[in-house]
Amino acid sequence: MANTASARKRIRQNERRNARNTARVSRMRTFVKKVEAAIASGNKDEATAALRAAQPEMQRASGKGVIHANTVARKISRLSARIKSIVAA
């Protein structure tokens, strides 16, 4: 248990931040799942629209420091490549 007032305050801050960050990651994952579902259905237009909606959410999570910027770039790149492969097939 925290002994000092500042340590108790830090615990409160960490709990709030943890809840906020968890919500951000969850929201981002939901958007990514929508993109993956659209890719699985084979609908290129739907997948493109879903990626267009997911991209700002992913970048926002990166900007807030929830996940690393390179991770977001890699995920966006891989999703884009999968959408392009729908067109080629």
From Swiss-Prot:
One of its GO terms (biological process) is translation. GO terms for cellular component: small ribosomal subunit. InterPro entries: Ribosomal_bS20 (IPR002583), Ribosomal_bS20_sf (IPR036510). Pfam families: Ribosomal_S20p (PF01649). GO terms for molecular function: small ribosomal subunit rRNA binding; structural constituent of ribosome. Keywords: Ribonucleoprotein, Ribosomal protein, RNA-binding, rRNA-binding. It comes from the Bacteria. Residues 1-24 are annotated as: Disordered. The keyword rRNA-binding applies. NCBIfam families: S20. Belongs to the bacterial ribosomal protein bS20 family. Binds directly to 16S ribosomal RNA. This is Small ribosomal subunit protein bS20. It comes from Gluconacetobacter diazotrophicus (strain ATCC 49037 / DSM 5601 / CCUG 37298 / CIP 103539 / LMG 7603 / PAl5). The gene is rpsT.
